[in-house]
Amino acid sequence: MGPVTDQNGYNGCVGWTWLDLLNSPLMAGNRRRWNASHTPARFTTAYLRNDVGLEIYKLATRADEFPWTYPPRDDGSSGLGGAKALKAAGVIDAYQWTFDFANLLAWGQRQPLALGTLWTDVMSDPDRDGVIHIGTERQLKQADADGEGHEYSLIGCNWPKKLGRIRNHWTEDWGLKGEALIPLDELETLVMSYKGDVCVPTLAAA
């Protein structure tokens, strides 16, 4: 998946999620496209630096559905904003959404996905095995009322163990060196009951 990134306290989880996706092996062709227009060494598949997350965040705020942009307002963006920005830049040719959990599982076993879901306080603290839980119904409803959300990558599904693996952008100090496991039934609750979004970017040829 490339180096673990750090969103550095910005509300730019969207930008760093798309950075993580672009640094994944399956998106090497898309990464090459970014490098072709942003680095002196064109047509390389070298990993993108951490500060690219901030650049994508800025672009996303200009393409999303919200009435602000960063800078000056660091109020976040959306998965749609990130996808539209990278499509406009020619980094991805297309993207689609999946609104069915079975489709999420199917895609999640084929390529990394961008997830935007409710994020409760307890999800920030993986247990000793790197597993996160979404908390109680009361905690979920409180997070929903407070508008607490987060964008992150789904990088795999272990169907026998009923676990999804996610990549965050809070340094290697978080979870399993920047990643965590989430029970699939709890992920389904976030996506289906609390209207999470699941973006599937089109992979470019490497």
Residue ranges and their predicted role:
Residues 1-206:
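Catalytic-core signature of thiol
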